[in-house]
Amino acid sequence: MRNYLLVLFAMTVTACSALQPVELEPEYARQAAAAPHWDNLRQATPDRWLYLLNDGPAALDWRLRAIDSATDSIDLQTFLWHFDTTGSLVLDHLVRAADRGVRVRILVDDTFLLGEDNLLEALHEHGNIEYRVFNPYKRRANGFLARQILNLGEFHRLDHRMHNKSMIVDNQVAIVGGRNLADEYFGLDHQANFRDMELLVGGTPVQELSTIFDDYWNDHW
C-alpha cells in the first residue's frame, strides 16, 4: 500500500508540468577531411569499403585508433555509456582529440546516463566538445527505477529512446553496429559479456551515416 501511494504521488507531481524545450541552432557534419591513415583499407574499393569488427578487444582498439586519427571532427552516438575501463578509455581519447583541435559532438540517450551530470557539465567547459542528451528526463535521479517513477507523468517520453550506435571520424570513416560503450560489450567484463558485431565503414556510406547523426542531433527530442 505504501509503495502504491508513493507511485501515485509521483504521478501527481510529475503531471503538474511539462519539459520545456530548448531551442538550439541546427548543426551539421563537416565536409570530409583528408584521411591518409585509412589509405591501405580503401585501396581495393575506394568508393566504399567495409571491415568486420567481430572481436570485442580488437573492436575497442580500432575505435581508439580511429579517434586518434581524427584531424577535423568526431561525431559519436550511443544508447549506453558506462565510465568503466572501456568508457573511460574512449572518453580520454576523445578529450585528447578535442585538445588538439578536433570538433567532438557526443549524443547519448538519457536512459542509463545516471549520476554523470557533473561529468557532462565538465565536458561542456571544453571549447571543442559539445554533447547533447537525447530525450532527457526532466527529473534527475541516480537510480534507474527512481527516475522512471519520478517521470511517470510524462509516460509518452519514457520509451522514446535512441538505440543508435555510431562513431564518424572526419566524415571519412565510421564504426557502426551493436556495441554500447561498456566493458561487457568488448569482452572486458569479468562476469559476463555480450556477443556483438560492428562494421568499420569507409567511402560513400559514411555520408549517409552523417546525415542520420545530424537528424538525431537536431531532433527536438
Region locations from a protein language model:
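Bacterial signal peptide processing site
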Residues: S17-Q20
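Active-site microenvironments that recognize anionic phosphate/pyrophosphate groups
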Residues: I74
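Sec-dependent N-terminal signal peptides
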Residues: L6-L8
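C-terminal motif of bacterial Sec signal peptides marking the signal peptidase cleavage site
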Residues: T12-A15
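HKD-type phospholipase D/PLD-like phosphodiesterase module
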Residues: A32-A70, L80-W221
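Positively charged n-region of N-terminal signal peptides that target proteins for export
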Residues: M1-Y4
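Alpha-helical transmembrane signal-anchor/signal-peptide segments
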Residues: V22-A32
